[in-house]
A protein has these predicted regions:
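Bacterial Sec-dependent N-terminal signal peptides
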Residues: 1-24, 308-309
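N-terminal catalytic or cofactor-binding beta/alpha core of small enzyme domains
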Residues: 23-303
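Short, conserved catalytic or adaptor-binding loops enriched in Gly and charged residues
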Residues: 253-254, 309-312
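C-terminal outer-membrane/trafficking sorting elements
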Residues: 311-393
Length: 393
């Protein structure tokens, strides 16, 4: 009997993982560029973390190229993706260049980034084409309440995150009133957010106020500039304000209606070890969830269909929070006028709780010890069967 229960749990878990983890991945020519298609209103690009070194593409020599690899930025982005999925149930759009920077620099214009090599030019076009596709899809699915992050790593001696909004270090040192003028708003990669955020925060407040992205990161123990505590970087720190990608794939470019920034990660305590990457990825996830909630009034939790926090999510079944802490109340949003029978199964396939549920009901998780469980929801009237994986911490 126990063996049958184990088999049942394994089959259900396999189904649940396959169903929930399904993600389309598209590779460009020769697998140089990778696009992991997402459903979150978040697009992340990683241009400088690759290590492919094909002999068919000569090293770039045009216009004083930079060859430095942003070490472990791909690994960091993948860990961010995993943490976002754990917390929200959905993935961001993720675009990765696997070519070494000596072969391709997507953060330069085509001439300087590919130096006339046809293979590199194809990869450059695919990289930017995938970003365009990701942001267009995100905008269409989420009513332009979207965000873009171009992920890099810096080697500056000050171990802090540098957020580039296309404003120079000297410009960030200006007064709030000056930064709030139309002149500096037009320079900014978040100018659309300034014009349309639910709390009517000013440009300066969104750059370095208590609810800026830098401050959210700092509150999660990752000092960032600009932020409330570090409002500007100073003019001697070699601060990175943002490059070609940010200028062309955010609302600084009229043809790219998405807010965003370039994020330069320090090496120590973030990129240098798997454990540090995991800690940072969780902090980033918590920060971006807070950012969307604060400025877009959008909840990323239970995200298969996103909506504003104040609206009922237009999704057939939602279970939250997930992951949860033992003792939390498990909330269910179910279709109205339909009664479901539920069973909660542990890893042995044993039913640890069961009962009936209707729209907007909840159950106590006190019976659930830390671990992985499956919630099986069934409605005999219409042969509806739903299986959801939950994690109790």
């Amino acid at each position: 009997m126990i063996a049958k229960r184990n088999l049942l749990f394994i089959l259900l878990l396999t189904f649940a993982i396959f169903y929930s983890n399904a993600q389309q991945v598209i590779f460009g020519t020769n697998n140089f560029i990778e696009y992991q298609v997402g459903t979150l209103p978040l697009v992340i690009s990683v241009p400088h973390g690759g290590n492919l070194d094909p002999s068919s593409i000569p090293n770039r020599i045009c216009n004083n190229p930079v060859y430095t690899t942003d070490e472990f930025t791909i690994e960091t982005a993948l860990e961010i993706k995993n943490k976002l999925f754990e917390l929200t149930g959905c993935y961001p759009h993720l675009i990765i260049s696997h070519l070494k920077r000596s072969k391709l620099d997507p953060n330069r214009n085509l001439a300087d980034g590919a130096c006339g090599n046809s293979e590199a030019e194809t990869a450059w076009n695919e990289f930017h084409g995938f970003i365009t596709n990701g942001r267009n899809t995100a905008n269409q699915q989420n009513n332009y309440k979207t965000f873009f992050v171009d992920l890099h790593g810096h080697g500056n001696p000050i171990q802090r995150i540098e957020l580039g909004y296309l404003l120079y270090d000297s410009e960030l040192a200006l007064s709030d009133s000056t930064l709030n003028t139309q002149q500096y708003l037009n320079y900014s990669s978040i100018k659309n957010l300034v014009l349309n955020n639910v709390n009517n925060y000013t440009h300066a407040e969104l750059l370095r106020g208590p609810y800026s992205f830098g401050t959210f990161l700092a509150n999660n123990n990752f000092p960032s500039v600009p932020s409330q505590n570090i409002p500007f970087p100073g003019t001697t720190s070699n601060y990175f304000s943002g490059g070609y990608i940010t200028a062309n794939h955010t609302c600084y470019n009229i043809g790219a209606p998405i807010n965003g920034l370039q994020m330069e990660l320090n090496y120590n305590n973030i990129r240098n070890t798997p454990a540090n990457r995991t800690v940072f990825a969780l902090a980033f996830t918590q920060s971006i969830v807070s950012y969307f909630s604060t400025h877009f009034n959008v909840s990323l939790i239970g995200c298969s269909t996103l909506s504003t926090i104040n609206d009922v999510l237009e999704k057939k079944i939602i279970i939250y929070p997930n992951p949860l802490v033992r003792g939390d109340i498990i909330h269910f949003k179910l279709p109205e006028n339909i009664e479901y029978e539920y069973q909660i199964l542990n890893t042995l396939g044993q039913i640890v709780d069961a009962g009936q549920l209707k729209h907007n009901q909840s159950i106590d998780s006190s019976k659930l010890f830390p671990g992985v469980f499956l919630i099986r929801l069934s409605n005999k009237n219409n042969n509806d069967l739903n299986i959801h994986k939950i994690i109790v911490q």
